[in-house]
């Protein structure tokens, strides 16, 4: 026996082997058949994973499998278990501490899914800022799904209940199988080419990962990203996620939820419309009242025709007095001159010259009197013209022709609908006014 090697106890050896297995080998994926599956009350699962020539004990602890599909697995099924190797020291048995279980054959699909997810995410296809907003009230809704599946019926019934006025266009496509991705892309391109829809629903019912695999196609994801029409995905159930969900402008948990997401609720919409109509009616009432106040203010600012005529009469009287005063001064001045001339003539006693001067004086007085009459007549004519003009534009002239001004509460009425049966209205005539009661309203 070599003296250089330490002597270990069984426990020490098992502990070293356990440390080596856990720290050096790391995470492994192991495919095999389940056997001896045990589900004790502790919540931990124990089973053996075997192939044709070997087997390994596996432990799947409760804190790891709470969301696992293991409850649906049974003895004899092929799975891929992912976990770390360890050693059960008490018996010296090494085992696999399982962290995840999938059906055999699904490991590659999950790997492809994660690789594509990372690739598209790095290109920014999942970024929220590149996603298009959904229309609030779409006129036409496009549906890309199988025309015979349960999903289309759920969508149509939801749309009919929430927003029956929307037009529906169905773009049929396979949603499962090898040709499904190409058909989904074709339907998406066709909807964009038509340009008739404001939003598209990409949907199918629930299923296994293989059933939903068509929606993990890279080319389909890129077509969703460049679609000019917003795309809402409603694929599978709430726990199902596909690449199409990440790229879509909005991800709904189910086809029914997708139909709900793209439509407004009719009752809520009617309430919004009622509120808008009430606000519009209130705004119109306020506008009309404001215009009525402005009109009344303008009417109050218009000068009374009688007051205007009175002002002109006063001006005319003033001008007449000024004219008479000027003429009187002029006559008196000339009389004084005549008297002076008469005195001078009498002093010289030139009888002939006096007679001639008297004759000239009489003619001058006649001319002055004639000029005064002409000036007075012209002023009277001008005054008459002004009075006629004022009378023509005066509301009083309209009243003189048999018309009347009707008012209610000192506000002029322009239409019969401004009064109601039983109202008391004032009717102003050319001479006097009447207080009347409305007994009938005619259009």
From Swiss-Prot:
GO CC, any one term: cytoplasm
GO biological process, one term: DNA catabolic process
Gene3D superfamilies: Nucleic acid-binding proteins (2.40.50.140)
Record has Translocase as a keyword: no
Classification via Pfam families: Exonuc_VII_L, tRNA_anti_2
EC number(s) on file: 3.1.11.6
Enzymatic reactions: Exonucleolytic cleavage in either 5'- to 3'- or 3'- to 5'-direction to yield nucleoside 5'-phosphates
Subcellular locations according to the entry: Cytoplasm
Keyword DNA repair: no
One Gene Ontology molecular-function label: nucleic acid binding
Principal location class: cytoplasm
InterPro entries hit by this protein: Exonuc_VII_L (IPR003753), Exonuc_VII_lsu_C (IPR020579), NA-bd_OB-fold (IPR012340), OB-fold_nuc-bd_dom (IPR025824)
Keyword line: Cytoplasm, Exonuclease, Hydrolase, Nuclease
Top-tier EC class: hydrolase
Function: Bidirectionally degrades single-stranded DNA into large acid-insoluble oligonucleotides, which are then degraded further into small acid-soluble oligonucleotides.
Record note on quaternary structure: Heterooligomer composed of large and small subunits.
Similarity field: Belongs to the XseA family.
Name this polypeptide is given: Exodeoxyribonuclease 7 large subunit
Organism: Legionella pneumophila subsp. pneumophila (strain Philadelphia 1 / ATCC 33152 / DSM 7513)
Name of the gene encoding the protein in the UniProt record: xseA
